């Protein structure tokens, strides 16, 4: 039996931690942040979400979010040359799951966050825009939370799988 070792093991640890950190951030939004924002008057909820969206693309979070994707893809290249070993299947599953998280982020969340940035929180259509944003954004966030955390779990399993 062969366990993942050497540089691929280091990459797997990085991928597991990165996916877990990203999933944890998304979990916070799903578990309580969006619910709390939804309880605020629309103008306050919009303003708070706009402020978070401006702060989110910090270097540290971008490294965790997209760096994990890059590491996962590189790690999958290694896994593809070891398909006879069980850890490789878990690495490929972890990568696929995490990439779903990234795709949902880029294709769904970023455009909606950009559109929300253009909404005047005190404008006449603000309450309607917020109502259209809040629930679907949260539902799709559940998906990226689940896929990021499931990806992290798959990477962790790969570390101990022979």
Predicted feature locations:
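Core segments of transmembrane alpha-helices
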Residues: 64-75, 144-152
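Interfacial segments of alpha-helical transmembrane regions
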Residues: 5-20, 77-100
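Hydrophobic residues within membrane-embedded alpha-helical segments of Major Facilitator Superfamily
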Residues: 11, 18-21, 26, 71, ...
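Internal alpha-helical transmembrane segments of multi-pass membrane proteins, especially GPCRs
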Residues: 13, 92, 135-138, 142-145
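Mid-bilayer segments of alpha-helical transmembrane spans in multi-pass integral membrane proteins
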Residues: 99-107
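Interfacial loop at the N-terminal end of multi-pass membrane proteins
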Residues: 9-10, 21-66, 111-135
């Amino acid at each position: 039996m062969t366990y993942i070792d050497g540089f691929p093991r280091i990459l797997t640890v990085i991928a597991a931690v990165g996916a877990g950190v990203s999933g944890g951030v998304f979990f916070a939004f799903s578990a309580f942040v969006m619910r709390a924002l939804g309880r605020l008057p629309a103008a306050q909820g919009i303003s708070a979400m706009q402020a978070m969206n401006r702060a989110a693309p910090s270097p540290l979070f971008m490294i965790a979010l997209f760096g994990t994707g890059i590491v996962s893809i590189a790690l999958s290249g290694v896994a593809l040359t070891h398909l006879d070993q069980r850890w490789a299947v878990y690495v490929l599953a972890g990568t696929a799951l995490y990439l779903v998280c990234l795709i949902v982020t880029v294709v769904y969340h970023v455009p909606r966050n950009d559109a929300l940035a253009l909404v005047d929180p005190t404008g006449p259509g603000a309450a309607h825009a917020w109502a259209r944003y809040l629930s679907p954004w949260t539902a799709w966030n559940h998906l990226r939370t689940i896929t990021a955390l499931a990806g992290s779990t798959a990477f962790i399993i790969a570390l101990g799988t022979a």
